[in-house]
């Protein structure tokens, strides 16, 4: 059965609110708050009585329900007192008046406001002879002000003596002059949309004011030409007078006027890899291990009933293998130091320099005796194990295990024996 999808009405008109509507909602809110004051006081007395009844009970016989009820009543009493105090002191309404009074005065009492059709559903309460919305807060001072305001809304027709009231005063007729007919400068006129925007900025914390993009106008006096962007050179150039000024551009597009640098490929250096392995063993590397790895290790230690102070590198490797965290093998000394605070193995500077010197010295004999079908260097853990044997650093040999595969271990021993003969070193068999 085919499904039918109802089309939305694309021409549906979205109605935008007005300042008059928002202001009326605020006034209604304040009135409702005042009407709700007796109920809040009654609720406060009721909660205070319930709390006093709970406080009179023996604390040793308190149940979880009593504790929750007591906490709820204390919070409710505190909130009710704050609300009652705010309503009685008119704190919220006074703050609203102080913040919005200049905007409301301009909106309702300023005859120079321009209706630019950006604010919809404009209230015509004043034009219909109803009270000004500010009358909720202020009383009219005199009848003369009302008569003068009504006279300003009367426009005489040509030579005829008849008069007619208009709901909106046309901006073109708002000019001041003397009896001789001389016209002076008109005051700057405001728009309803601008006032509405200012009102929302003051009253609505979630409202984001729309920021208009600044026009690219030339700064040369008496020019006012439009500036255009020359992206290749990074300049803003005036189309009228040719004035240019540099501008900072951030872009990922390449500039073809600038020469491109060749990113050359560099050969992998074995000595760098050896240095990295030594740093990892001594926990000197800078690495960031996720917290979930530490938490998983601690849970596994608790499950196996292993004291963290008895944990060593080899046990930690087995735990990481079980947890499927093999990629952290090379950071085992660092992880161990974080878990139990034990100092990792540490080579003296002299021993570390000797190891690096021995490593550099075997590069030439390795190139000579390396089988033709072999491309990679010897296993680094195997090489470091042999260096520790030659330098009599037996306490470090356990940190560099030999190969588990006997066939591969024999191949390494064969190459290493030739290197030892070439260098004049003593050869230690692995098997």
Curated annotation (Swiss-Prot):
Give the domain of life: Viruses
Q: What name does UniProt use for this protein?
A: Putative transcription factor R429
Q: Which UniProt keywords apply?
A: Coiled coil, Metal-binding, Transcription, Transcription regulation, Zinc, Zinc-finger
Q: Where are the zinc fingers (unnamed)?
A: 218-241
Named from the GO MF annotations, one term is:
zinc ion binding
Q: Which source organism?
A: Acanthamoeba polyphaga mimivirus
Role noted for this protein: Putative transcription factor.
Composition bias, Low complexity: 143-152
Region annotated Disordered, chain positions: 142-187
One biological-process term from Gene Ontology?
A: regulation of viral transcription
Q: Which family does it belong to?
A: Belongs to the nucleo-cytoplasmic large DNA viruses (NCLDVs) VLTF-3 family.
Give the compositionally biased regions (Polar residues): 170-181
Q: Which residues form a coiled coil?
A: 28-95
């Amino acid at each position: 059965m085919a499904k039918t999808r109802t089309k939305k009405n694309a021409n549906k008109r979205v109605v935008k609110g007005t300042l008059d509507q928002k202001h009326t909602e605020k006034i209604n809110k304040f009135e409702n708050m005042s009407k709700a004051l007796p109920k809040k006081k009654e609720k406060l007395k009721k909660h205070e009585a319930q709390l006093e009844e709970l406080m009179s009970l023996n604390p040793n016989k308190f149940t979880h329900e009593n504790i929750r009820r007591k906490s709820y009543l204390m919070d409710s009493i505190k909130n009710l007192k704050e609300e009652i105090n705010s309503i009685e002191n008119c704190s919220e309404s006074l703050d609203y008046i102080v913040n919005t009074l200049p905007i409301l005065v301009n909106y309702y009492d300023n005859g120079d406001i321009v209706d630019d059709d950006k604010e919809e559903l404009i209230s015509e309460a004043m034009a219909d002879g109803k009270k000004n919305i500010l009358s909720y807060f202020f009383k009219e001072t005199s009848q003369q002000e009302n008569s003068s305001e009504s006279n300003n809304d009367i426009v005489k027709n040509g030579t005829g003596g008849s008069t007619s009231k208009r709901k909106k005063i046309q901006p073109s007729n708002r000019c001041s002059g003397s009896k001789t007919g001389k016209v002076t400068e008109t005051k700057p006129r405001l728009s309803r949309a601008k006032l509405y925007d200012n009102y929302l900025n003051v009253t609505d914390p979630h409202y984001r004011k729309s920021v208009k993009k600044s026009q690219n106008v030339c700064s040369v006096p008496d020019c006012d030409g439009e500036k255009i962007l020359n992206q290749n050179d990074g300049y803003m150039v005036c189309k009228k007078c040719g004035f240019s000024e540099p501008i900072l551009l951030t872009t990922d597009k390449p500039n073809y006027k600038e020469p491109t640098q060749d990113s050359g490929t560099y050969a992998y250096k074995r000595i760098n890899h050896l240095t990295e392995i030594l740093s990892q063993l001594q926990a000197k590397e800078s690495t960031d291990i996720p917290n979930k790895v530490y938490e998983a290790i601690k849970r596994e230690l608790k499950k196996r009933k292993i004291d963290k102070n008895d944990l060593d590198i080899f046990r930690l490797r087995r735990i990481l293998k079980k947890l499927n965290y093999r990629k952290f093998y090379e950071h085992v000394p660092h992880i161990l130091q974080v878990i139990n605070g034990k100092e990792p193995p540490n080579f003296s500077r002299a021993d570390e320099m000797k190891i690096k010197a021995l490593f550099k010295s075997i590069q030439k004999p390795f190139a000579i005796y390396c089988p033709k079908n072999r491309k990679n260097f010897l296993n680094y853990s195997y090489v470091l194990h042999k260096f520790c044997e030659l330098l009599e650093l037996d306490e470090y040999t356990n940190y560099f295990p030999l190969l588990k595969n006997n066939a591969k271990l024999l191949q390494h021993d064969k190459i290493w024996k030739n290197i030892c003969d070439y260098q004049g070193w003593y050869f230690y068999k692995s098997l």
